[in-house]
Amino acid sequence: MGRNARLSSDAYPTMEDLSKLTRRWWGPLPIVDNTVRMAALAEALWGAGADMSSFIYLRLSGGVGGCVVSDFRLVGGAGGLAGELGHMTVGANDSPCACGKRGCLETLASVPALCEHAGVADITQLRAAVLSGDTRARDALERAAQAVGYVLGSAALLINPRAIIVAGEIVDAFPSLRSDIAAAMYRELIPVMEWDIDVVGASLGPLGAAQASAYIAARPFEEDAAAAHHPEGGSPREAGPASSMEARADRGGRP
């Protein structure tokens, strides 16, 4: 679950440091992962991805984060860094990114980037500007949709997901953005091949990541706890809102 990934900065504690600290009071080892991956797991367990073996989760928020579910499992890669779609380079964009690179998707499609390009202070002002027909705001949103579609198209060529699940404040503020993203994504796919990739909204609220984290923490010694949503000997669990972690776990068994 990302435990092999190390940041190059000394500003963050290592897993060893965190383990020593937490074991002063608790027995189990800590499990470290990011909010986007836990939100993707929640969607796989109880949300929009509950009947899908493979999907890409993308969150457009203060940053741009991604996660891949393939064959009913979260994909972490060799060091837990797989799915960093927000830091794929887009076209001729040369804007500096907080990660240290230039031209990342995050510099076009995150809330701060969109607000900066549109000349507004926050997402509320951005929505008002777009709805009022402000050219600068609309251009910024269109540029973001095209960039997101480009990145998702490239990712789709690699893993052939059943769907793209998009989440975050930007999608909440502009529901029609999903169709713009889908159109841009399909332009990147091979036209002579038959593709069936839906771009859908996330169905769980902001507590989804916390619920999935609790689910994982309750199963620290189960190797398959990170499996997305394929119960042993059965079909994927039913879709629906994660109103209760305990109720869902009782109904569906372990993933």
Regions picked out by a protein language model, each given a short descriptive name:
Residues 34, 60, 168-169:
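Short secondary-structure boundary segments
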Residues 52-108:
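Glycine-rich phosphate-binding loop of actin/hexokinase-like ATP-binding domains
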Residues 1-13, 163, 168-170:
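Short beta-strand-loop/turn "lid" adjacent to the catalytic site in phosphate-handling enzymes
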Residues 1, 37-40, 65-66, 75, ...:
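Short, active-site-adjacent cap segments at secondary-structure transitions
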